[in-house]
Amino acid sequence: MDSLANRISRKIDAIHAQGLNAYYFTDIIVLPRKLVEIYKDEICDNNGNIDISRPKTQEIHRIMLKEVFERFPTLDGLIIRVGETYLHNIPYHIGNGPIKKNEKKTSSITYRSDGGEAIHRDLMNLLRDEVCVKLNKKIFYRTWDFGYFHTVPEYYLNVTEYVPTHPNLFICVKHVRGDYHRMHKFNPTLGIGKHKQVVEVQCQREYEGKGAYPNYIADGVLNGFEELRNDVEPYCLNQLKTNPIFAGIWTWSRGGGWVGPYITNELWCELNTYVLAQWAKDTHLTEGEICKEFARNKGMDGINAEKFCQLALLSADAIVRGRASLIDNINVWWTRDQFISGSDELDFVGFIRRGNVERLLAEKKESIAIWKRMRDIAYSLEGTEKEILKYIRSSTDYGFILYSIFEQGFLIMMKGAEGDLTGVYDIRTLKKAFRNYDKLWKDYETLKNKNSECATLYKPYSFNSRFAPSYCDREKGLKCSVDKYRMIAFER
């Protein structure tokens, strides 16, 4: 324990040496297992969960907060998460989220609620008193959870209106209503209430490649994603920046997700982070100006910087069409980390019954056409380091092949589902799609074998959180879904 504490102290010193403030992240509720055993009757409910509303639990947290800053007096503040409490690598601790999942909303509540408003209020007030007021340190309270604090304005206000503002108290809110998916709306809890807000942005999205291929989200965050531009304002940060409670952004520059793909080059994550960070420093700058500056910093001249930024912008168009949809409601969880799900996550019967088959298939083809344009740009680029240029090209190839696999897999599952409903299968189309699909997987593996800088590859299986540490469910996923129709296509 002393060794870890000393490492943290050195890290805080290193952060300060760079002219930055040091804010450490912690989950609530997590307590030493031995302490819980001693005080179980005073801090746990009838189900054995630690109850933050109990006086002894709050007393323990007040003592803990005081001791943290006594041990690390130069620590500038804490980032508090209450929505996900994971205990995977801390065997001597125990914990749970503070909001009881079985709580029911009262009849006086007219909005979606998990009943946790009072708990959030009490916890925020405790943190405010112990850290912001008594110690003059900062608290960043994240609204992210599995309830409705981070998505429902009425819930948000019913918590925050009962917590006095303080110069050291910030509320952190994801820019999207929910997790970091395309097609999710801009967060309606941004820009409301009295408390200063810091907007959270993920630069390495686990649902969209984790940097294995171009995925430029900075433009969409700042100016509005294509799918949001007919929404009521604000739908982007440039429409929020003049709000007096907007206090800035913080990026998840890396991280997100549970497994791969694992990247060897941070280029695409770095691009998102750089553009957002420079904009946060000067919100008068445009996304385009900053993107070109990034490219010039990588050694590209004016023409090549323009090309690079065009490639980046096109990636957002390709991804929303290839992985999500502007036409129908597609389950945004069908790919995550290194896994590709299949019919178990996608409602092909619904697509068919809504009459969207041809439009959806055309949309997937449009995604591939955009990826081809991106490849053309990538291979025309000049004027940067050889290593960077090689990664731009191979990562764009990676995206092109992967999304081509998505497209052919989608075609097979769609045509297979049509056959399931009608009893008549389009064998010719299925056979052609399988030939393309099988070749694409070989091309994908060849790309990785010939380009060591490529990220690790996706797998045609489903993600399952119960299957640690691989999280790989081989009984479900793209392979199982298409193989069902492989037998039909080649046995007739």
Regions found by a protein language model. Give the residues of each.
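Intrinsically disordered terminal tails
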Residues: L478-V482
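Aromatic-lined carbohydrate-binding surfaces of glycoside hydrolases
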Residues: M1-G178, E208-K210, S253-K281, L314-D317, ...
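Noncatalytic linker/hinge segments flanking ATPase motor cores
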Residues: I15, A22-Y24, M64-V68, R182-F186, ...
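Tryptophan-rich aromatic "cage" segments
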Residues: D483-E491
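Active-site core of glycosidic bond-cleaving carbohydrate-active enzymes
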Residues: N168-G257, I263, K365
